[in-house]
């Protein structure tokens, strides 16, 4: 890898990151040191693995300083949205960002977004700039317009355009939240103009924090003269993140008038914040996360971490809004509350949260479901959208506000549902002010000091108030009514203590549970058996009634007229009898418990609907479990089949190995035999060469003989037995007569050895040879059979096409062996 040319900023930041590792060898960092450090940048492990492969091309398992620089560059590009194909370590850019560093800075001080100067974001959009962005909007939308949302650009087109700006994805998430505040996944023309305008501002001023809302004049400057299709950008002040949250859009119902006021309030707050930040230190505010973290129990924290691990299946160390919102939606909280919860934990508007922030969000949701309002949980309201419950109460009766019990003070006033203020007259506060609240202080304190208590704890807190304390305040009817009107009890319980049934009461309902504190547990406890200590509790309760209260005769008739009403959840029976005698009998005799004629609680339509949904969910879960079990069995069968197949393949492999060994042995034997044959062939070749030499010598001899025989002066051929004329004794010639004086010439001598024509004897008269030749002794004549055999051998060679002269010589040389003669003639060809 060639040395990289780093910019001054990159050189400084890369060296700082390397110094934070404290490696033993600064020029060679092992993978065990640099690997865990790279995981802190928040990228998926698959991308980090590819980046490592790009840098460690030699697979050494360690990186030198130049390779670490290249790794930092690639991580920075990946953080800014570059794909794996677009990564290039030769391209300079901004240093990478450590999410952990931003988290540590948040624990030290408030986010810089609270003290940042948002002045550039208050500048209205220039008409020329708006026209340019509108033209760009039309060009990119042409041919891609959705028929369901005409005139709107889908996120699949808008987001790639924004990614070309090379801004960090966290900054782009904030820009998208401000543009598509309703989170419908589409941008209108003016929203696209706002998004492009914010991109230009962030690039020009190098900003990474954006305000949570834009001033109204900036939004208006993004709109052209033509009215927009809708105004969903004004339908929210703060939204969680850059995610597809169409599930939330149908729940938003804030009016445009109300939102415009909020925009003005937000603009004023931003302006005032800028002035305060410029001339003074940042305001000290209460961090809700610190308070809520202290409320999380170790068991809950462990459960929240497990849920976080299931959502973060890639082990990134954080989850984005698209992963968290569907999970948070299961709480059935309002979308505005979920958005507020998200903003509470994502204080830097990064668009993602870690597991600690996720635990805080889950704890807030848990507290919210327990009945506490979001404002009381967070201990302050950053962006109030409507008057608080406390203001409504004070406007009704300012004198009574100081007499409200502890449970309804500033931090807990929102626990009172809206139905209290709407349905009860002003006398309600007077009743609270004039009543003795000592009996209710334990309940109030338990709610205030331990807001994370479970629903069962809340129920027991209301039930632990002794009946003796309630009876001691029987003349204070209003206070008794407060304790008597929990959902588990009935309004007629006050009649037992001599209180008229017409007295108004305040139901202690908790926000989020329409049926009251105990209603959330009613459906669950209806199917459970009666507690074992229920008889003892009722017996003790009646003993307290017997010893602490005297029922007036006029109240007995009221008891007789009243219907059988169930006691609170702790009790399982009603008061038997309707006369004072029956009551006296019940005080002295332990009467058996009787089941009430009417059910203790008739489920409402909403509860029935919820129960139906739960049943459907249970059935769906059962079906899912059955499907999983079936799939598990199928997978198990496939595994067994694959194991069997693997065993078969192993056996076949062993057989193939045996065949291979046998083939190798045969090949070795064949090679040995081949070598032996080669040796034999070599020896045969040597013999052949020797035979050829001998044949050549013999051929030379034959050629010399033939040459001698063809020479006219040669005598070799004459003396040869093969061509030597046969001399036969001439028949006796008659004696010449004297009368004959001239003899005719003799016939010519034939050189044939044919027995039919024997050669004529040579005489002195007709022979040209010397006389001594004639007088030489002649060889004995051959037999007729021998001559006949020699002629047959000669004819056989002649039939093979050999010349006659050479055939005769070859027969002579081989002693008339026709095979040897043929070989000699063939070698001489």
From Swiss-Prot:
The modification Phosphoserine is found at residues 112-113. One of its GO terms (cellular component) is actin cortical patch. Residues 466-506, 574-590, 764-774 have a biased composition (Polar residues). Residues 93-121, 466-520, 574-614, 724-785 are annotated as: Disordered. Residues 10-109, 129-225, 300-398 form the EH domain. One of its GO terms (molecular function) is polyubiquitin modification-dependent protein binding. This is UBA domain-containing protein 8. Transmembrane segments: none annotated. InterPro entries: EF-hand-dom_pair, EF_hand_dom, EH_dom, UBA, UBA-like_sf. Keywords: Coiled coil, Phosphoprotein, Repeat. Residues 43-78, 333-368 form the EF-hand domain. Residues 775-785 have a biased composition (Low complexity). It comes from Schizosaccharomyces pombe (strain 972 / ATCC 24843) (Fission yeast). GO terms for biological process: actin cortical patch assembly; endocytosis; endosomal transport; intracellular protein transport. The lineage of its organism: Eukaryota, Fungi, Dikarya, Ascomycota, Taphrinomycotina. SUPFAM superfamilies: EF-hand, UBA-like. Residues 602-709 form a coiled coil. The keyword Coiled coil applies.
């Amino acid at each position: 890898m060639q040395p990289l040319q780093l910019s001054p900023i990159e050189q400084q930041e890369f060296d700082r990151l390397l110094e934070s590792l404290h490696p033993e060898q600064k020029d060679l960092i092992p993978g065990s040191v640099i690997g865990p450090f790279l995981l802190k940048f928040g990228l998926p492990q698959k991308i980090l693995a590819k980046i490592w492969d790009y840098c460690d091309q030699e697979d050494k398992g360690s990186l030198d300083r130049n390779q670490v620089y290249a790794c930092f560059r690639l991580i920075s590009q990946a953080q800014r949205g570059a794909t794996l194909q677009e990564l290039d370590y030769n391209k300079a850019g901004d240093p990478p960002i450590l999410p952990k560093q931003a988290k540590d800075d948040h624990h030290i001080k408030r986010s810089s977004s609270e003290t940042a100067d948002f002045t550039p974001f208050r500048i209205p959009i220039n008409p020329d700039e708006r026209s340019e962005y509108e033209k760009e909007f039309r060009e990119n939308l042409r041919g891609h317009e959705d028929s369901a949302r005409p005139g709107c650009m889908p996120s699949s087109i808008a987001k790639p355009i924004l990614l070309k700006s090379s801004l960090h994805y966290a900054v782009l998430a904030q820009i998208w939240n401000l543009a598509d505040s309703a989170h419908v996944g589409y941008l209108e023309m003016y929203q696209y103009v706002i998004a492009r305008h914010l991109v230009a501002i962030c690039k020009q001023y190098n900003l990474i924090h954006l305000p949570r809302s834009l001033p109204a004049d900036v939004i208006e400057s993004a709109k052209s003269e033509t009215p927009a299709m809708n105004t969903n950008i004004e339908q929210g002040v703060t939204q969680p993140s850059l995610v597809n949250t169409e599930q939330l859009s149908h729940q938003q119902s804030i009016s445009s008038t109300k939102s415009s006021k909020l925009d003005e309030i937000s603009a004023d707050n931003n302006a005032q914040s800028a002035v305060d930040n410029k001339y003074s230190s940042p305001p000290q505010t209460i961090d809700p996360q610190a308070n809520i973290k202290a409320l999380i129990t170790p068991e809950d924290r462990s459960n929240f971490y497990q849920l976080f691990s299931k959502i973060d299946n890639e082990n990134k160390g954080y989850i984005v809004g698209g992963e968290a919102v569907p999970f948070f939606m299961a709480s059935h909280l309002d979308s505005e509350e979920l958005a507020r919860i998200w903003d509470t934990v994502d204080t830097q508007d990064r668009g993602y949260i870690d597991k600690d922030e996720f635990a805080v969000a889950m704890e807030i949701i848990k507290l919210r479901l327990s009945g506490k309002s979001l404002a009381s949980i967070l201990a302050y309201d950053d962006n109030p959208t409507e008057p608080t419950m406390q203001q409504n109460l004070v406007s009704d009766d300012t004198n009574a506000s100081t007499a409200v019990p502890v449970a309804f003070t500033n931090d807990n006033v929102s626990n009172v549902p809206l139905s209290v203020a709407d349905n009860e007259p002003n006398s309600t506060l007077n009743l609270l002010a004039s009543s003795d609240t000592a009996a209710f202080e334990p309940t109030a304190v338990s709610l205030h000091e331990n807001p994370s208590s479970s629903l069962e704890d809340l129920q027991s807190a209301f039930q632990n108030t002794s009946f003796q304390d309630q009876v001691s305040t029987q003349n204070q009817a209003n206070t008794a009514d407060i304790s008597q009107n929990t959902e588990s009890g009935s309004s007629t319980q006050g009649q037992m203590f001599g209180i008229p049934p017409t007295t108004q009461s305040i139901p202690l309902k908790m926000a989020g549970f329409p049926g009251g504190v105990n209603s959330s547990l009613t459906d669950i406890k209806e199917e459970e058996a009666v507690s074992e200590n229920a008889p003892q509790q009722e017996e003790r309760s009646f003993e307290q009634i017997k010893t602490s209260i005297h029922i007036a005769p006029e109240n007995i008739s009221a008891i007789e007229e009243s219907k059988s009403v169930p006691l609170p959840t702790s009790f399982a029976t009603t008061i038997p009898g309707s006369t004072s005698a029956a009551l006296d009998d019940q005080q002295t005799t332990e009467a058996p418990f009787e089941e009430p004629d009417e059910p203790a609680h008739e489920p409402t339509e909403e509860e029935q609907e919820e129960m139906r949904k739960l049943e459907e969910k249970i059935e769906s879960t059962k079906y899912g479990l059955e499907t999983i079990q079936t799939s598990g069995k199928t997978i198990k069968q496939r595994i067994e089949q694959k194991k069997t197949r693997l065993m078969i393949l192993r056996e076949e492999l062993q057989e193939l190995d045996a065949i291979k060994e046998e083939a190798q042995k045969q090949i070795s034997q064949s090679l040995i035999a081949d070598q032996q044959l080669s040796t034999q062939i070599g020896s045969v070749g040597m013999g052949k060469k020797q035979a050829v030499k001998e044949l050549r010598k013999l051929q030379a001899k034959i050629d010399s003989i033939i040459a001698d025989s063809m020479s006219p002066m040669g005598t070799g051929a004459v003396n040869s037995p093969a061509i030597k004329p046969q001399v036969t004794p001439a028949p006796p010639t008659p004696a010449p007569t004297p009368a004959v004086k001239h003899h005719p010439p003799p016939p010519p001598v034939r050189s044939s050895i044919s027995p039919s024509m024997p050669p004529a004897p040579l005489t002195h008269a007709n022979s040209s040879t010397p006389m001594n030749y004639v007088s030489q002794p002649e060889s004995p004549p051959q037999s007729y059979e021998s001559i006949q055999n020699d002629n047959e051998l000669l004819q056989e060679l002649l039939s093979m096409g050999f010349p006659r002269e050479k055939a005769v010589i070859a027969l002579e040389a081989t002693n008339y062996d026709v095979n040897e003669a043929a070989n000699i003639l063939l070698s001489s060809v």
